[in-house]
Amino acid sequence: MADTPLTDRLDRRTLLRGAAAAGVVGIAGCSGNGDGGDGSDGGDGGDGMDGGDGGDGGSTDVIRWHAGGTGGTYFPLSGEFEGVIEDQTDFPVEVSSTGASVENVGSLGNGDADFAMIQNDIAFFARNGERLAAFEGNPVETLRGVATLYPETIHVLLNPDADVSSLSDLEGARVNTGDLGSGTQVNALQILESAGGLTTGDFDEQNTDFTQAANQLRDGDVEAAFVVGGWPVGAVEELATTTDVEILDMSDAERQAARDDASWFADDTIPAGTYGGIEEAVDTVSVQAMIATRSDFAADTVEAVTEAIFENLDQLSIKSEFIGVDSAQDGMSIELHEGAARYFE
């Protein structure tokens, strides 16, 4: 797509915008009436288990985009996507704050969301029905990928008074591992076990969203909290301006152990000065953030949304240095939606 002449792209966009104007009431399968009241039983897309991509589905007045907590990166970046999509197409977009990856996959699977932000590892688990209780033996066969975006960095935030210098030092500590059932919790438990030798009985597990985890650290209610998001994470920035906080600098051995246990982890580094009071670079690991959708969501709409985002990257300010056409399939862990594939081919 990137090599297509500008005039051809403009003509194509005109056609897509026309399709949007003509088809805005039929853009989503299993979408209900757009008010969230009974979104799981609208249309005739069913559960999508035996269908291909791009069904015409039911009716909706808005693209329902599920993001994450307001203190993370998913929510503000989704707000920027909303602005670009509404500016470049005739589709209205509604961005919702959610518990992020695991919840978002469930919303896509039952038709309550049309697009969602998720982690690439959670996408793999959900599509293949493994490793997570929410999906074990019950794969979300309608889950489809749109694009990967940027590294989702694992932040292990520490109370400076806790005297923690390694993951194994968290034995017996109060540790917030993220929202119950979230991708953050999954990553935290994986890392604590593989790199720290700790299972859930070895520490006092707490479960809240990013913002509440920051509050717990500020109030001294936990010794450590896991936050997963592209740096700088808003909740961490805010915490660092009001509270002394440290971020665990993972050793080479800890990072290697995490990578050996889970292939979706990659080495990552939080640059010095990213957060107030953190004067040195912090070594850690990361996963990938991605946009996902449903197999029964209209291919023309997915293509139009994908094109709107990737042809207007200059309008993004959050994570724009990582998001691009050339890297949009790096770490893609599930099958692409037909509409996204048409754009990137």
Language-model regions: role of each:
Residues 215-228:
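Charge-rich, low-complexity N-terminal segments
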Residues 146-147, 280-282:
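Short Gly/Pro-enriched turn/cap motifs at secondary-structure boundaries
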Residues 209-215, 328-336:
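Short, conserved secondary-structure transition motifs
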Residues 158, 289-296:
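Short, well-ordered beta-strand elements within core beta-sheets of diverse protein domains
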Residues 1-134, 140, 150-153, 160-169, ...:
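Terminal disorder- and signal-encoded targeting elements
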Residues 117-118, 208, 226-228:
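Short beta-strand and adjacent tight-turn residues that come in two discontinuous sequence segments
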Residues 103-105, 213-216:
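Short, hydrophobic alpha-helical packing/hinge segments within bilobed ligand-binding/sensory domains
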Residues 178-198, 207, 214:
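Loop-centered beta-sheet repeat module
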